[in-house]
């Protein structure tokens, strides 16, 4: 009770106009938020409306465990719930890829579509989300419509209500994106589908972008894919306090008709105690 009282009191004080301006200034926030008690000032995790969402007028924040989604039990027990991607790790990953205007972007387990909207900042030839939960897919379509109205010059977003583990990719070059959507058993099926896409057309080029790669071993084990990128990407100052951590591991693999990577990306990926977050071995998880 005392903890709740203190939290409510602090929240009330920091919302006062003068204090709020100082506390929310990026240079001040960067210092205070990582400190002990910083969560009292800034909240924690996915549950606060994200600045990216507020700016665009979409609703993609929050965390929804699988038991709150309208999906059957066989998927619910192997899914990991919904949470929106942080913009900076997605942008850093996509900035590292060449020739994007020749690629189609697929978000496997796209949820409410935030990663798709971030990807719409880039010149992909198509943007497709694959989502199994009807309620998430519907919200994703509403968010995509808002994005299309505000940015009509961008590539249109399509969201397919489908099972990512049985999804058949169309012809052409692919960027396949995942933000830790489900457990390894289902991730392995996505890997098999990507391998089948490569086998069906050896001339196609494929990149796989995996944020918070808890099932990294599934892709590392594939004979059709090789790592090209592995980094711990800090959140932007404006994003801190709106996700589960202060940075995020991103790993990218490539396959098909692509030249061998020019840089090593064989960093060891480790995990926190409950196995929900991945981090590169040289960084202490926070």
Task: Describe every region a protein language model picked out.
Residues 113-117:
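Glycine-rich SAM-binding Motif I of class I
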Residues 185-258:
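C-terminal substrate-binding/active-site "lid" region of AdoMet-derived donor-dependent transferases
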Residues 2-101, 137-172:
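S-adenosyl-L-methionine
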Residues 125-128:
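Short beta-strand element of Class I
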Residues 133:
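Conserved SAM/SAH-binding beta-strand->alpha-helix loop
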């Amino acid at each position: 009770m005392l903890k709740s009282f203190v939290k409510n009191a602090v929240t009330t004080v920091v919302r006062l106009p003068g204090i709020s301006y100082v506390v929310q200034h990026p240079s001040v926030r960067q210092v205070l938020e990582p400190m002990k008690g910083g969560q009292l000032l800034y909240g924690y995790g996915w549950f606060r409306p994200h600045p990216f969402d507020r700016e665009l007028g979409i609703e993609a924040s929050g965390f929804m465990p699988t038991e709150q989604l309208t999906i059957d039990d066989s998927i619910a027990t192997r899914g990991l719930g919904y949470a929106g991607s942080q913009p900076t790790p997605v942008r850093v990953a996509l900035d590292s890829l060449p020739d994007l205007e020749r690629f189609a972007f697929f978000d496997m387990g796209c949820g409410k579509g935030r990663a798709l909207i971030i990807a719409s900042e880039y010149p992909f030839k198509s943007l497709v989300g694959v989502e199994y939960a009807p309620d998430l897919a519907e919200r994703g379509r509403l968010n995509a419509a808002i994005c299309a109205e505000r940015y009509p010059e961008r590539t249109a977003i399509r969201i397919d209500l489908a099972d990512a583990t049985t999804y058949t990719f169309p012809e052409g070059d692919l960027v396949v994106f995942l933000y830790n959507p489900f457990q390894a058993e289902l991730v392995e099926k996505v890997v098999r589908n990507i391998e089948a896409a490569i086998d069906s057309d050896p001339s196609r080029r494929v990149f796989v972008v995996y944020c918070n790669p808890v099932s990294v071993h599934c892709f590392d084990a594939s004979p059709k894919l090789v790592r090209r990128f592995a980094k711990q990407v800090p959140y932007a100052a404006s994003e801190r306090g709106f996700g589960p951590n202060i940075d995020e591991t991103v790993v990218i693999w490539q396959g098909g008709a692509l030249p061998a990577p020019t840089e090593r990306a064989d960093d060891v990926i480790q995990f926190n105690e409950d196995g929900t977050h991945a981090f590169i071995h040289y960084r202490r998880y926070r």
